[in-house]
Every structure is written in C-alpha cells, then in structure tokens.
Amino acid sequence: MKTAHEVRPGNVIMLDGNPWVVLKTETSRSGRNAAVVKLKLKNVLLDSTTETSFKGEDKLDVIVLDRLDCTYSYFADPMYVFMDEEFNQYDVEAENLGDAAAYITDGMEDVCQVTFYEEKAISVELPIIVTREVTYTEPSARGDTSGKVMKPATIAGGSTLSVADFVKTGDMIEIDTRTNEFKKRV
C-alpha cells in the first residue's frame, strides 16, 4: 500500500477491482487544505483512460504485473500466439494488441514483452525499433528535393507510414513503434 502522494507514473494500482496504470500524477497544495493528487489512469483490461483525484494521504493498492520475453509464433483467429524460451505458448486477443498488430508478421524474430495479469496475457509490447520490408511505395518524383520530402509506403504487415523519398519497394527500413515513424533505411 502506498499513499496517493507516493504513486508515480508507471505504477499499477487496483481501483474498484480493476488494475489501472498511472500515466500522469499532479499534486496541488492550497493554503490550509490537504494536498490533492490528480491521477491520469489507463485501465489495463479495457484500455480506457480516466482522471481521478485523491487526498494526499489516501492509501492505494499498488500491484506488480508479470512480464515475459516472447516471440511471435502464429495467428489463430482471433488470437495471436506468442512463445517463450521454454516453448510455452500464450494467447493474446487481437483487440489487446492495439497498435502493435500492425507490426506483427509471420517469421518475425523480434522479442516482445507479454504482460500478464492473473496469469492471463493482456498485452504485448514491441521493441522500440523494428525492421520491416517496404512492400509498396510510389517511385520518387524527379526534381522534388526541397526540404524533407516524404511519401507514403506500405510495409510487410499491411500498415502505411510516411518514408523518405529515396526509399524504394523492397527496401528494409527501421520504424519507431511508439510513434509509427520512419527512422532510416537499413
């Protein structure tokens, strides 16, 4: 148990029987009144966000979620199956993947972190940088070289993002999975 004052972003707290990740904390103190802590929270199971306030001395139940390094194995509609080093398989529902689903492809060797709550896989966190092949992009426009020229490209897995003008179909590129931005050609 921690007081609301001691809770930091990244902590997972239990409220009304649901686990919530603390995204942001803001403490305000005014004159004679007790400190008030405002928390921005994200529900681990439902992927919804909310803001709530607590008195600084309110006790909150902080929990620790299990994380395990796994690799993607296969897709069994509607579940994505991941495997750890000991060949244990874990099913993650497609809706729990969120934006990560765009980067999951057959044969990928990236190590992902699977998060568990009560022994159930609830989310997958990809590495920050992934390398994917450009499956389609328009040819470069000649003479358009002023500034940072970007064009749309489709990568393996089907998602579309903006890439530099010099990238061609078949090139391997690095992508930042947090921002969905092109980093460089490999």
Swiss-Prot record:
Protein's UniProt keywords contain Protein transport: no
One GO biological process term: peptide biosynthetic process
SUPFAM superfamilies (UniProt xref): Nucleic acid-binding proteins, Translation proteins SH3-like domain
InterPro entries with a match to the protein in the record: Elong-fact-P_C (IPR015365), NA-bd_OB-fold (IPR012340), Rib_uL2_dom2 (IPR014722), Transl_elong_fac_P/YeiP (IPR020599), Transl_elong_KOW-like (IPR013185), Transl_elong_P/YeiP_cen (IPR001059), Transl_elongation_fac_P (IPR011768), Translation_prot_SH3-like_sf (IPR008991)
GO cellular component: cytoplasm
CDD domains, per database record: S1_EF-P_repeat_1
Pathway(s) this gene product operates in, as recorded in its UniProt entry: Protein biosynthesis; polypeptide chain elongation
Molecular function terms, GO-annotated: translation elongation factor activity
Keyword rRNA-binding belongs to the record: no
Keywords on record: Cytoplasm, Elongation factor, Protein biosynthesis
Similarity section: Belongs to the elongation factor P family.
Function statement: Involved in peptide bond synthesis. Stimulates efficient translation and peptide-bond synthesis on native or reconstituted 70S ribosomes in vitro. Probably functions indirectly by altering the affinity of the ribosome for aminoacyl-tRNA, thus increasing their reactivity as acceptors for peptidyl transferase.
Name of the featured protein: Elongation factor P
Organism expressing this protein natively: Shewanella piezotolerans (strain WP3 / JCM 13877)
